[in-house]
Amino acid sequence: MTTGSGVAVAVSPHLDDAVFSVGGTLAALAAAGWTVRVVTCFTASVPDPSPFALACQLDKGIAADVDYMALRRAEDEAACAVLGVQPVHLPLPEAPHRGYPDPAALFAGVRGDDRVAAALVPALRPHLAEADLIFAPQALGDHADHRVVSETVAALRPDGLWWRDVPYVSRQPAASPWRGVPDGVEAGADISDHLARKVTAAASYHSQLGFQFGQIGVAPLLRNLAAEEAARLGLPGAVEALRGRMDHLRLIGAVSPGARGMDVVPSAAVQREPLKDRHCD
């Protein structure tokens, strides 16, 4: 990990994605003296949600009169405080508030009439312009919001580092990055010293835990996944896997198996939750 006063920006589709996926790396950068920001794209409160959007709230046990997104923004602030990073919330609506009518639509590609990228580009541009390191999702799982973010960041800052989306990667470990993600080296960042902090931060998203992690639970899944990623890449310790330029990967202390002359080994067996057909986030 390179110490210094650089600026790192993680572009998160939803209020939890960056912390679930690369929270250990973000905590390590903050501990090394970097300024770290998590810029979450789709955080707007919507006073009159569509039936599907409201269902995404009700099925988590949250009453209809609660401002669901305000609750989630507060959870994100708590999680970021644990990691020592700064939260930034862009006031754009999530896909269920943009005309996606059901879970199947969320994973069927970006709608032709979805113009949110036109608003996302100018909202993101100033945050990306000042960053020395950019983190963004590979869009594993093919959620429309993740794909919009991946494509937008790839257009603005193709030199980013691309994370494997959690919890989707735990359900689909062999999934490939969305085709719009730039080619790059895959490497593992050792988060052994920061895994406990990542788990604590992830547990701040109380409204999402049962829905996203099921009976396995957030702590076992994140610990198992970090060990799995290390085994898959032939690396020791607990690892978050990222893809990108080798010079940027070296800034975070990430190691490529090829660079070490190591063979990739099969992923360790771990209990998995099935994909939920009603998945909203």
Which ranges hold each PLM region?
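The feature marks non-catalytic terminal segments
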Residues: 2-4, 74-92, 101-105, 133, ...
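Active-site beta-strand->loop->alpha-helix modules in alpha/beta enzyme cores, enriched
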Residues: 1-151, 277-279
